[in-house]
Amino acid sequence: MPGPARPVIAKFQRALLAWYARHGRDLPWRRTRVPYRVLVSEIMLQQTQVERVIPKYRQFLRAFPSLRALAAADVAEVRRLWYPLGYNIRPVRLHAIARETMARYGGRLPDDAETLRALPGIGRYTAGALLSFAYGRDAAILDTNVRRVLGRVFFAPRSLKRLRGDRRFWQLAEWLVPAGRAYDFNQALMDFGATWCTPRAPRCGRCPMRGFCARNRTCRNGHAGP
C-alpha cells in the first residue's frame, strides 16, 4: 500500500497536535511516565469507558502503588479491588505481568516491543502505548478510536470496505507518528476519536481535518460512516 503524500502527513500531524493542545483531556494517567502506572491505566481502559476507570485507577494504585506491591499481593485481592470494571481476566493478567517482571526483569518493565508482547495480556497496542507513553519511543498505537479516525481521513469509503484486518492501519499509524512527538500524537489520536470523530454525530463541520479528509465529502447530517 502506498503511503500518504508527505504534505498530507504533515498537515494531519499539525492539525491533530494543534487540536490536542486546545481540546486534549486531562486524565490522571497522563500526569505520569512511570511504566507501571501507564500499564495499569492501559489494562483498565481495555473495553471500559474512561469515566469508569478514573476512580478505580486511583483506588488500585493506593492499594498497589508499585509493581513490587502488586506482585506480592494475592490474586484474589487484586480481583476484588478490580471489581466492578468487568472482564475479570484482566486483573489476573496484570498480576501475572507483575510477577513475571519481578522474576525475570528485576521489577523493571521491558522497554522493547518484542519482550513486552511476550508478557501475558500485552498485545501490539499495549506495547505501543507503553513505549510511547512511558519510555518516550516513537511507537504507533491502534485501537478502535484510532482506526476510525485513520479510516475516515485516509481511505475513501469503497477502498475502506475492501480492507481486511488491521495490517494496513498499523502500517499507516507507523508512517504518521512524528519523530519525537509520539506521546502527544498518540494521545491526540485517541482523544480525537473519542470526543470529536465519534462513531455517531461526528463534528465534521468543525473538523480540523476537513480540508483533506477523504470522508468529509460524504459526511452529511452528522453521518460519516464507519
PLM feature segments, named:
Residues 3-10, 14-15, 19-222:
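Catalytic cores of DNA base-excision repair glycosylases
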